[in-house]
Amino acid sequence: MRPIFIMVKCELGRAYDTAEHAVDEIEEVSEIYSISGQFDLMIKCYLPEDMDVGRFVNSRIHALPHIRDTMTLITFNAFAGRG
């Protein structure tokens, strides 16, 4: 499985609604964080290695309600701390 992060900008006041829909409707979603800055949410997903990331984002993430913009980050390596 390959982790990706999707930064999501939502319509004003609708970030929590969007997060709830994502958790309920998209099984690949692992975690969602509300964040500060130019985006409202950071969604962590685990995708099968052979899944088309662009198609997943376009068909599943962009279909969520109240989304205005996204930025997808594809991971290379994971580093873990001690504890």
Residue ranges of predicted features:
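A compositional/biophysical signature of low hydrophobicity enriched in polar/charged and small residues
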Residues: 1-83
